[in-house]
């Protein structure tokens, strides 16, 4: 204010002015105000020096030291902010910068005294605002340079990763969404690209895994990224090196990658190696964080909190990705469209405002279209960059192969000439010194001369396939001829042909064929070497053949010895059994022989009589004998077995009729022969014999059927027919002691006949009369089958019932036999046909 007033005075002061007095008064007034202001400033400066002097005195240092310490504070605060932004440990920053501040003020307590005595709330606010403004400006600058840094990375790396700056920005955003900071992900991504990780890799997963691992372990990012770069060059070798350095992959994973690479699947091998490495780093990160102590975990959380705060500040200047721009444009258009739809029909809105709303909507729509176009262009750029990176990688690979192959195809003279021309051109253009030229040219000449001194390799002689096949067949022929001669010279059972003897013949035949082949063609190096060692090979084979023959003979002798020992054991046990069975029955002697056979079999197998296995077998055999003895005492089982055999024989209609027909045809043939030779035949005996066999067959079947029916119907005494039984009528009641026939037996005998049996009459006469003689049959055949029913009880009533049942059986049997004979003698029957053929 004082300077402005004096300046105005200098400009406006004019001696000739009519208002000189007024101006002079004005000057005096301004000078007075200037003096007062100067006095106030001097007083304030004096008070400030007093405060500084007091603060310095409280801190125990001089005013000069105090002023120097205060001047260092802004620099200390700047270092703190920079280190926090760089992701360093907050505790380490506190120890480092706090120690410097403490040393500046002479200790911890003097530091706080000095700060409390000099820093007022206003100064704190102004300082905080200044620091915040500076940090905000720094964050904006860092964020705005993100795309520029990404572009520099892609250009300097040749963009072998096949990415764009926008794609890198999106990948960093993905890492930020996954819990990392933008700087962590972008730094890991940048180092991976610089390390040479090629296109097609999963940069999002890899960059996040690297960022997490380096943050938890403290390993430099560039070191981990370099390990990924080795995978791009050679997946198997790179994975082995990574396992040796970080121990994050297993041998099985390395073997899988190697198998893919050997099969020619380079892309699959690289992808598998990247996946194995990423999974390994993630597992190690989790293990490190899970094993942190309480203090270490708290420090790690605080460090990540500072990083997140600084990362949020850096977001101020960072550009948006194409997708984020589209999302924001869509939100802006949606909002503008909603406002337009809300206001376009509002009668309180004038035309100017309505036009403004429409313009806002159209502007938002155009911005959305532009954002979508930019997103499409970004996607196209990403795809094109990926294709170009892959193509460039292949071109470089094949160029390196071509260069290596070209060097291999050059002759020694061509290499020397090219080197000489290169050196001459460099010398002519002044790009090489004469001394260096002489040394390089002499080295090239010596290398050329050394190649001339090397002996030329003669091409290896290869035996044609046809010659090899002929030699093999000839060797087999000679071998078989030798084997045939040995077999023809066989004189005794001790002649042997061991496997080693056959190998000797094979070697002899092989050498014979080689010697014959040497006369007609050039032998290969292998064949010459084999032929040179003929004597040694054959002598060794001859020795082996003799040993082999001895082994075969000894094996045969051992087998004979074993057979002899087994025979001695068998005869010894058989002799002992024979001696012990003297005076025994045939059955007991047979059992003793079986026990002796069991024992000699066990001994010949290598066991002894006291073995538990043999004792178990002997007990099982004796248990079988005991069961046989038990069955011999069971007469009922014997009777049942006999009846079962009888029933089985009677039910074999096929076998019985076959035997009957065979006997009949034989009898007819014999009678015919007798008629032709002697003029007469005994047809009566033949017919009688035939009828007797037929009667036996019918009688067997009748008895089996009758007994089966009777055994299922035992129990009636004085009962009667139970009736057929209607729908609601019971079929009768059976009382105790009654005999009940089955339905089939009742139908076969007849209800009327059964009633007549109960009364004493039946077909054929009175049942209870003075006995029924044998039924007479045609041709003089008599059938007599008496039936007796045994009853163990002495009850008279039951005895009478048994007599009646026996008579009923006899009547049924007689009727069945007579009916069968009657059918046989009728026209068409067996007997009728046999007798009428004469």
UniProtKB/Swiss-Prot annotation:
A GO BP annotation: viral tail assembly
Keyword field: Coiled coil, Viral genome ejection through host cell envelope, Viral long flexible tail ejection system, Viral penetration into host cytoplasm, Viral release from host cell, Viral tail assembly, Viral tail protein, Virion, Virus entry into host cell
Tagged with keyword NADP: no
Key word Coiled coil present: yes
GO cellular component, one term: virus tail
Main location, first listed in the record: virion
Cell location: Virion
Compositional bias of kind Basic and acidic residues: 380-397
Region described as Disordered: spans on this chain: 378-397
Parts forming coiled coils: 399-419
Function: Serves as a ruler that controls the length of tail by stopping the tail tube polymerization and is probably released from the tail shaft during infection to facilitate DNA translocation into the host cell. Assembles into a multimeric linear form probably arranged as a coil of alpha-helices and stabilized by the covering tail assembly proteins. Its C-terminus fixes the tail tip complex, thereby forming the tail assembly initiator complex. Tail tube proteins polymerize around the tape measure protein, displacing the tail assembly proteins.
Quaternary structure annotation from Swiss-Prot or TrEMBL: Interacts with the tail initiator complex presumably through its C-terminus domain. Interacts with the tail assembly proteins.
Assigned protein family: Belongs to the Lambdavirus tape measure protein family.
Protein name in UniProt: Tape measure protein
Organism: Escherichia phage N15
């Amino acid at each position: 204010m004082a300077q402005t007033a004096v300046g105005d005075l200098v400009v406006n002061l004019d001696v000739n002015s009519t208002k000189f007095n007024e101006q002079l008064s004005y000057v005096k007034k301004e000078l007075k105000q200037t003096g007062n202001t100067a006095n106030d400033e001097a007083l304030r400066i004096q008070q400030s020096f007093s405060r500084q002097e007091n603060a310095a005195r409280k801190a125990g240092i001089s005013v000069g030291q105090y002023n120097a310490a205060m001047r260092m504070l802004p620099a200390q605060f700047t270092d703190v902010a920079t280190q926090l932004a760089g992701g360093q440990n907050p505790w380490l920053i506190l120890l480092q910068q706090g120690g410097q501040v403490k040393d500046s003020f002479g200790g911890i307590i003097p530091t706080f005294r000095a700060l409390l005595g000099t820093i007022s709330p206003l100064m704190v606010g102004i300082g905080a605002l200044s620091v915040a403004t500076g940090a905000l400006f720094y964050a904006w600058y860092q964020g705005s340079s993100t795309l520029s840094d990404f572009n520099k990375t892609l250009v300097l790396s040749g963009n072998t990763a096949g990415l764009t700056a926008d794609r890198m920005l999106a990948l960093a955003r993905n890492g930020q969404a996954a819990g990392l900071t933008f700087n962590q992900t972008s730094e890991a991504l940048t180092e991976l690209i610089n390390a040479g990780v090629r296109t097609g890799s999963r940069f999002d997963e890899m960059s996040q895994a690297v960022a997490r691992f380096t943050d938890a372990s403290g390993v430099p990012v560039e070191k981990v990224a370099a390990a990924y770069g080795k995978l791009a060059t050679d997946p198997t070798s790179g994975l082995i090196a990574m396992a040796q350095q970080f121990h994050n992959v297993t041998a099985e994973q390395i073997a899988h990658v190697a198998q893919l690479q050997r099969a020619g699947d380079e892309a699959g091998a690289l992808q598998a190696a990247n996946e194995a490495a990423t999974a390994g780093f993630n597992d190690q990160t989790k293990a490190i964080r899970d094993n942190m102590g309480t203090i270490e975990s708290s420090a790690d959380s605080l460090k990540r909190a500072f990083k997140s705060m600084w990362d949020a500040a850096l977001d101020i200047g960072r550009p948006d990705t194409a997708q984020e721009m589209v999302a924001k444009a869509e939100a802006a258009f949606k909002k503008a469209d909603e406002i337009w739809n809300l206001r376009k029909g509002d009668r309180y809105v004038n035309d100017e405002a309505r036009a403004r709303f429409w313009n806002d909507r159209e502007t938002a729509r155009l911005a959305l279209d532009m954002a979508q176009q930019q997103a499409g262009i970004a996607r196209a750029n990403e795809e094109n960059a990926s294709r170009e990176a892959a193509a460039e990688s292949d071109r470089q690979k094949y160029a390196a192969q071509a260069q290596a192959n070209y060097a291999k195809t050059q002759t020694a003279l061509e290499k020397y000439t090219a080197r000489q021309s290169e050196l001459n051109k460099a010398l002519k253009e002044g790009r090489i010194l004469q001394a260096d030229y002489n040394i390089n040219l002499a080295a090239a000449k010596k290398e050329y001369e050394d190649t001339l001194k090397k002996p030329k390799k003669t091409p290896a002689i290869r035996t044609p396939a046809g010659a090899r096949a002929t030699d093999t067949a000839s060797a087999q022929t000679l071998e078989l001829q030798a084997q045939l001669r040995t077999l023809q010279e066989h004189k005794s059972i001790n002649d042997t042909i061991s496997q080693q003897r056959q190998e000797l013949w094979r070697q002899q035949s092989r050498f014979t064929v080689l010697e014959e082949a040497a006369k007609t063609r050039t032998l290969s190096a292998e064949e010459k070497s084999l032929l040179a060692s003929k004597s040694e090979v054959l002598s060794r084979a001859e020795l082996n053949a003799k040993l082999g023959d001895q082994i075969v003979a000894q094996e045969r002798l051992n087998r004979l010895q074993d057979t002899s020992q087994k025979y001695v054991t068998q005869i010894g046990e058989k002799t002992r059994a024979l001696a012990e069975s003297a005076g025994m029955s045939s059955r007991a002697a047979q059992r003793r022989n079986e026990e002796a056979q069991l024992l000699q079999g066990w001994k010949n197998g290598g066991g002894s009589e006291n073995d538990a296995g043999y004792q178990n077998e002997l007990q099982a055999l004796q248990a079988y004998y005991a069961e046989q003895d038990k069955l011999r005492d069971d007469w009922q089982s014997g009777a049942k077995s006999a009846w079962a055999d009888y029933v089985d024989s009677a039910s074999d209609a096929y076998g019985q009729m076959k035997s009957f027909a065979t006997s009949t045809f034989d009898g007819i043939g014999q009678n015919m022969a007798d008629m032709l030779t002697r003029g007469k035949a005994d047809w009566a005996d033949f017919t009688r014999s035939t009828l007797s066999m037929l009667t036996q067959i019918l009688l067997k079947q009748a008895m089996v059927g009758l007994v089966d029916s009777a055994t299922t119907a035992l129990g009636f005494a004085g009962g009667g027919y139970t009736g057929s039984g209607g729908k609601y009528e019971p079929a009768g009641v059976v009382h105790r002691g009654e005999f009940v026939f089955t339905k089939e037996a009742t139908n076969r005998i007849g209800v009327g006949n059964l009633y007549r049996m109960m009364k004493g009459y039946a077909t054929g006469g009175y049942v209870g009369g003075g006995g029924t003689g044998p039924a007479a049959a045609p041709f003089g055949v008599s059938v007599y089958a008496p039936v007796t029913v045994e009853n163990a009880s002495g009850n008279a009533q039951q005895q009478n019932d048994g007599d009646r049942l026996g008579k009923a059986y006899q009547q049924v049997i007689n009727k069945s036999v007579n009916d069968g004979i009657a059918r046989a003698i009728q026209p068409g029957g067996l007997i009728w046909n046999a007798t009428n053929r004469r």
